[in-house]
Amino acid sequence: MEKIEGDFSKFWRFDVLPPINRLSWWWWWVLVLVPDPIHPERSRQLMVLWSSKETPAIRVSGHWWIPKARMYVDEEGGSVMSGMVCAWWYDGNKMFEPLLMKECRMASVDDKHPLWPVEAKETGMGAGAVVPLTSEDLSFGLRPGRRSFWLNLTSDQEKVMEGSPKDFSVEMTPWWERPSTAKYKNNVFGLNMGYDIQRVHGMKAKLNIDGEEVEGSAYIQKVGVQAPSLPWFWGMLHFDDGSYLDWFMPHVSPSFTMKDDTPWSMRDFFRTPNAGSGIFHDANRNRTENFKRCTVELERQEGENALRDEQGNLLPRFKIKVWNGRTQVSIHVRATSRARWVFDQPTRAGFVSHLTYNEYPLEIEKIAILDEQGLRSIDDYEWIRGNAEHAWGILN
């Protein structure tokens, strides 16, 4: 596969829907997963986010962000927006979070914009970039001809002093057709509320960490959301043969009333699923399974081998099941660390809405894939790497 397939005509634009005060939220999100030589059952992971929001003010993990201007879109479709570049790095043992949390102005252009380099050629194919206007190179982009994505990042100096790497650069190339073809979803509920999502489920990745190059995989998404955020579970797995699996279970729960980032609240004791789903790009069968049924169970790790986050909280274990009429997948995974983003947004009449968004690097304990051709287990794969999300609260 020589290039990344799919329609990238809107990948570098966020003006698909008219903005809604306090509800519109836009971001590009990249997750890179590479081997951990010390703990081979785990993975080292880098997450980078370029984000903006239509809001008078919002507190992000203790930092008040007050946008200085609204998003500006020129006649050629280029955008300039106030926002933040945020990142975390998990080295297999320690979570550096935030690795970076930097306010900046960002410009995004595609390969049809006059500012796109003339020498790039092959215009109109969806290449483009988001370039934070900072002294460091914090850019993310798709090269001409859609041959590869790139990402550059420089860590916060304080985190470098704590032991994190300073410089990261990533080159992401196609893996195979199904996971490396961009998937697009757009849904408008009414009153301009809805979502606009584009994802590339699986890419090969070469990650350079302070001069050390290591190979792994990457997941990329571009999201625009215009609706209150409710609690959810989400997660994904990359397999050594190029297979990709994910699950998504938004749910109704008393956890939407939670106002801090402390896990294991009594308010999170039951959850009513709301339209769970999943997808499995199965390289072994050369097919894609779409799932409309999904369950996620959450429990604390227990015993002498139980792991804790950087704040001393016991980490979770997830039990996931997705299935359709032909294939059923059951997964047992445990979190090996936790990165959390805590959002507090003033609303009406002095009230403040809250969202805690947790990201968990995973260790895969068991997996069972049952279809008409038989049963597969963790022993059928050289490695499986993944990440899971759990969010509570409601941001509006």
How should each PLM-predicted stretch be described?
Residues 1-396:
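Structured soluble/peripheral alpha/beta segments that form catalytic or ligand/cofactor-binding pockets
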